[in-house]
Structures are given as C-alpha cells and as structure tokens.
Amino acid sequence: MNGTRLFELDNRIRVVHKRLRHSRIVHCGIMINAGTRDENKLNNGVAHFIEHAAFNGTERRKAYHILNRVETVGGELNAFTDKEKIFFYATALKTYAERVLELLVDIAFNATFPQKEMLKEKRVIHEEIDMYEDMPEESLF
C-alpha cells in the first residue's frame, strides 16, 4: 500500500502509519467510526456536536490549553464530521509528533464536555448551519 502500514493494537484500535522521510511535518488524526449516518430523530446532530464540544476540555486540560498545546509550536488542530466519521487531526513540525499525538488521544478519550460550554457550542453549530444554508452549492452534496 505504497509504504503505508495498517495494524491493530490489543485494544482493537486500528492504526494507519505512513512515514515520509523527506517531510519535516507530521500529520496525525484520530477517526471515530461514527457519523451522521448513525443518528436518528432523537439524537440528530450529536456527531457534529461531539466534534465541537470535545475541544472544550479534557480531564487534564481546559479549552485554552488544548489549542495552545499545538498553536504555540506553529501547528494546527482541527476536526470535521461527515456521514461516516468524526475526525480529529493536527499538523505540526515532526519534532512535536509526540506532543500532537498525545493531545489528540487526550481529546478523543478524555473529553469532559463541560456543561457551561454546551450552550455556546450549540449556538456555534446553528451559525454553521445558517452559513451552509446560505450556500446553495452545499445542497448539491
């Protein structure tokens, strides 16, 4: 597979790894195998909500510290949701690979979803929905 390795850990987490020797950056991601396809009338929007809310704190970090952990070294942290998955990802210099991966694991497995932040996230998601509804080309996909 083009130098790409796929293996499964003892806890059944699958890992895809590809090393690019010439590159000085690392791009890491954690994919949660659940998306909008798994929603129904009772939990409609929950995947997108989790994507947003996971950045609001973990057992070890407040929201500010999550973003700061990658941005202070010139990296980028983001996420997206689609029908198949929730994907948390980060890009940084290779030197910071361990820092980036540790942060992604913390977000994916230790998010706390602080109650006081949830209403803010709900508003942000509604603003995103309004933005997409103003873009007719989005309805084609």
Indicate residue ranges for each PLM-predicted region:
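His/Glu-rich zincin catalytic helix
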Residues: 1-65, 102
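Acidic/histidine-enriched segments that form metal/cofactor-coordinating
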Residues: 59, 66-141
